[in-house]
Amino acid sequence: AEMRNFALRDAQGNEIGVFTGKSPRQAALKAANRGYTEIKLRERGTKKVHIFSGERVQVDKPAGAPAWMPDKIWKPKVKKEGIEKLD
C-alpha cells in the first residue's frame, strides 16, 4: 500500500500541514497527537476532506515499554465525523 498525503486544513480552509499515512485515520491520529481537536484532512490529489474530531488522553506507559519512555504518555483518539467534497 502506498503512503498517502493528507493536508490539514484550518477553519478558513488554509492548508496548514501535511500528515502522511496509509489511511486517513492514521494521519488523523498523528494530527490529534499534536493537539488538534478539529481535524480536517484533504487527501492530496482528491477533492475529499475527511473530518475527524480528536483528543489526547494521558495514560500510563504500557508494560514492556522501553525505559527511556516517560511514565505518562499521550495517546491520541479520533472519531470520524464524515467526508466533505470540495467543488
UniProtKB/Swiss-Prot annotation:
One of its GO biological process terms is: DNA protection
Which GO terms fall under molecular function for this chain's record? DNA binding
Show the InterPro entries listed in the entry: MC1 (IPR008674), MC1_sf (IPR036620)
> Residues of the signal sequence?
none
Keywords from the UniProt entry: DNA-binding
Q: What does this protein do?
A: Protects DNA against thermal denaturation and modulates transcription.
Write the protein's name: Chromosomal protein MC1b
Native source species: Methanothrix soehngenii
